[in-house]
């Protein structure tokens, strides 16, 4: 086990701003967009999926760099700090094993088939980037979770960010190997707060993927459950592909106990994962026998001293799950 875990930079562990401090009332609402190629074509048919697969050659993947981490945003008006307690009644959704257990390799501690690497093109600068993501069990069996900044560049002062292009998810990527193939994105969803204002407390996204050769991603790899409104102090396992560990070529893990990120709503853990692990899941109750847990956070930021942060999973995260989880 690698005891470590990104990502977006923040000034310090105690620097977080309450989620609703001076932000638009709809910051916890969500927006969706169809996935596109670099030329703007929607990924709506086999021909576009084929073009997407041809784009991500081994050479291009090797040259991709960890996703740009969100920089500091303009100061927001002060607001009373939010307490550390849950914001509502805790809830969970179940994890799901793959349909055919024989398709999984023998599990290794802290390596999960339901966690993988993401590659995409940033339309602003034309660069190729990488993040992490995780399959999550939903009615569609086609959804993965990641960070908001892995699907959208994030807005500034109400000017909306740009949706990423050529987006693919590779379950249990390992040194170029794609044991479950490459899943093309079909539709993204993230919070208004991230898309329009770059609100790091809403740096969460969910992505519907296309089936691959008739297999939905959760059926192929299994999918984690979802937890929300739990205490900010939890034993968690963080999984992802940090660029400062084996150049992001292997799945790494960090295990420890989370804490509240200063006076703000986010949670934090000392993991020291570098860029590339953005979007990796923070899991409660990871079962090493099947590599599945209950997702209660997503890798978002890093601050001084190796502290990593995740948005707090609350009722709006569950609402995002409900809104996107049945899309096929």
What does each model-identified segment do?
Residues 1-22:
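Secretory targeting and sorting signals
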Residues 15-137:
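Protease-domain processing segments flanking chymotrypsin-fold serine proteases, especially trypsin-like
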Residues 57, 118, 133, 146, ...:
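Terminal peptide-recognition signature
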Residues 98-129, 136-137, 158-215:
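Conserved catalytic-core segment of clan PA serine endopeptidases
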Residues 149-152, 173-176, 211-214, 243-244, ...:
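Acidic glycine-/aspartate-rich tracts in secreted/extracellular proteins
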Residues 185, 200-270:
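Chymotrypsin/trypsin-fold serine protease catalytic domain
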Residues 272-298:
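Catalytic nucleophile loop of clan PA
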Residues 296, 300-328:
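C-terminal cap/linker of serine protease catalytic domains
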């Amino acid at each position: 086990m690698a005891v470590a875990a990104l990502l977006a930079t923040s000034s310090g562990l105690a620097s977080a701003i309450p989620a609703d401090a001076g932000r638009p009332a709809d910051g916890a609402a969500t927006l969706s967009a169809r996935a596109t190629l670099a030329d703007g074509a929607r990924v709506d048919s086999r021909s576009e999926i084929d073009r997407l697969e041809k784009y991500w050659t081994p050479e291009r993947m090797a040259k991709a760099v960890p996703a740009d981490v969100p920089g500091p945003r303009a100061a927001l008006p002060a607001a009373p700090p939010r307490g550390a307690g849950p914001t509502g009644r805790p809830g969970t959704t179940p994890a799901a094993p793959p349909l055919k257990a024989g398709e999984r390799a023998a599990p290794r501690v802290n390596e999960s088939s339901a966690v993988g690497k993401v590659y995409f093109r940033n339309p602003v600068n034309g660069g190729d980037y990488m993040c992490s993501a995780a399959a999550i069990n939903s009615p569609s069996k086609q959804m993965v979770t990641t960070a908001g900044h892995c699907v959208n560049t994030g807005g500034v002062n109400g000017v909306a960010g740009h949706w990423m292009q050529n987006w693919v998810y590779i379950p249990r990527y390992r040194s170029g190997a794609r044991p479950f193939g490459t899943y093309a994105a079909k539709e993204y969803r993230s919070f208004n707060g991230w898309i329009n204002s770059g609100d790091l407390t809403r740096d969460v996204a969910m992505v519907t993927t296309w089936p691959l050769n008739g297999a939905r991603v959760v059926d192929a790899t299994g999918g984690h459950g979802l937890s929300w409104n739990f205490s900010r102090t939890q034993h968690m396992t963080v999984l992802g592909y940090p660029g400062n560990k084996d150049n992001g070529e292997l799945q790494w893990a960090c295990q420890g106990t989370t804490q509240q990120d200063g006076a703000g709503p986010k949670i934090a853990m000392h993991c020291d994962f570098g860029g590339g692990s953005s979007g990796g899941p923070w899991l409660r109750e990871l079962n090493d026998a099947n590599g599945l847990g209950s997702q209660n956070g997503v890798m978002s930021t890093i601050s001084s001293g190796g502290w990593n942060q995740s948005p707090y999973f609350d009722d709006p995260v569950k609402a995002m799950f409900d809104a996107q989880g049945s899309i096929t």
